[in-house]
Curated annotation (Swiss-Prot):
CDD domains: APH (cd05150). This is Aminoglycoside 3'-phosphotransferase. It is found in: Cytoplasm. It comes from the Bacteria. Keywords: Antibiotic resistance, ATP-binding, Cytoplasm, Kinase, Nucleotide-binding, Transferase. It is an enzyme of class 2 (transferase). It catalyses: kanamycin A + ATP = kanamycin 3'-phosphate + ADP + H(+). Signal peptide: none annotated. Monomer. It comes from Niallia circulans. The gene is aphA4. The keyword Metal-binding does not apply. The active site is at 187 (proton acceptor). Belongs to the aminoglycoside phosphotransferase family.
Amino acid sequence: MNESTRNWPEELLELLGQTELTVNKIGYSGDHVYHVKEYRGTPAFLKIAPSVWWRTLRPEIEALAWLDGKLPVPKILYTAEHGGMDYLLMEALGGKDGSHETIQAKRKLFVKLYAEGLRSVHGLDIRECPLSNGLEKKLRDAKRIVDESLVDPADIKEEYDCTPEELYGLLLESKPVTEDLVFAHGDYCAPNLIIDGEKLSGFIDLGRAGVADRYQDISLAIRSLRHDYGDDRYKALFLELYGLDGLDEDKVRYYIRLDEFF
């Protein structure tokens, strides 16, 4: 035991034994993320976050449990709530996250896997899905985030030249009339795909997953491509491979704005 692990659950410490822990800084987002060199013979990841409503790991744990056997996602190895913190130990998927330089070097291959991966996520049957993260819920959460001052006003000012309250008001005024509901990843960007060679290994960071408008993912995917490559040169290819005709640009802008609160 050392200073960083002294408050961890005893059961977790016993499970980990003397294995090597390394802080992980890309993918598997969370307050504290560790790469576990070996857990019962295989590598794993440990996520730790406060149990407060806007940072709890509970939604991700529920998503991973529901997706087990439906999509390639990490298997849950251990969970706990202890001392005001959530703990999630899960298997490590083989490969590298989509932002890794060796993956990004093969741009067209990445875009292909990126689009096909999203198509597989959105192809899940949602009729009995217990996870909901649609627009009304997102707006309620955004309102609470604004009211509790959980978003940096400077970031909103820099990007949109307004206050968080004004941006939230704009979202209410311009809310899309309809939702095209699918199972959505919720934070579909390059670091949240794991790619092994030339194949998609799986999806990570599913804390925002649930039934939502497909544009929740499409919008962030387009933004991620723009961020990675500096422009929209791969946007048309991504949409073609995903299988979308007639992009709703207003919805793209809307969901990118909404994501400022998350």
